[in-house]
Design a protein with these regions (language model features):
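Short, low-complexity N-terminal intrinsically disordered segments enriched in polar/charged residues
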Residues: 1-29, 120
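A beta-strand edge to alpha-helix "cap/lid" segment located at domain peripheries
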Residues: 3, 50-120
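Short, flexible active-site loop motifs that bind/organize anionic cofactors or intermediates
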Residues: 13-16, 39, 59
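Short glycine/serine/threonine-biased micro-segments
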Residues: 19, 43, 78
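Glycine-centered loop/turn positions within well-structured domains
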Residues: 24, 32, 109
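Short, well-structured alpha-helical segments
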Residues: 27, 46, 50-53
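A short gly/proline-enriched turn/hairpin at secondary-structure junctions
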Residues: 33-44
Length: 120
């Protein structure tokens, strides 16, 4: 039997804030010098992250339903079913994205969001 590890508290807080469309609460989960990479675009620091959150998370009413959590050598990998009002061109009906979180001092320092496809 495989057990799913519990989410790190700041990741749980982050996902709850995303699902509540709470811009300030989402940004508060990041370190001041954090990096977000989403769709091959980099957002460095909370000012840039706030703009991304306002437009693409809160603005598009994104929600995430966690489907899998894996701890991997200090990194937390969260797969989730994404929904919202974003452009779905060339995306599957059920969109599963993989989120790679790195946490330091109870803050997100790196979040990489990737649409993975099967290797074979």
């Amino acid at each position: 039997m495989t057990m799913t590890p519990a989410l790190n508290p700041v990741i749980a807080e982050h996902l709850a804030a995303v699902n509540a469309h709470d811009e300030d609460a989402i940004v508060a989960t990041f370190a001041a010098d954090a990096l977000v990479n989403d769709a091959h675009r980099e957002f460095w620091g909370t000012d840039a992250i706030r703009r991304w959150v306002a437009k693409e998370m809160v603005g598009d009413k994104v929600t995430v339903e966690v489907t899998e959590v894996t701890d991997h050598h200090g990194q937390t990998i969260v797969r989730g079913r994404y929904d919202g009002l974003f452009d779905r061109s060339n995306l599957p009906d059920e969109l599963i994205l993989t989120n790679y979180f790195t946490i330091r001092d109870a803050k997100i320092v790196t979040l990489i969001v990737i649409y993975n496809t099967p290797a074979y």
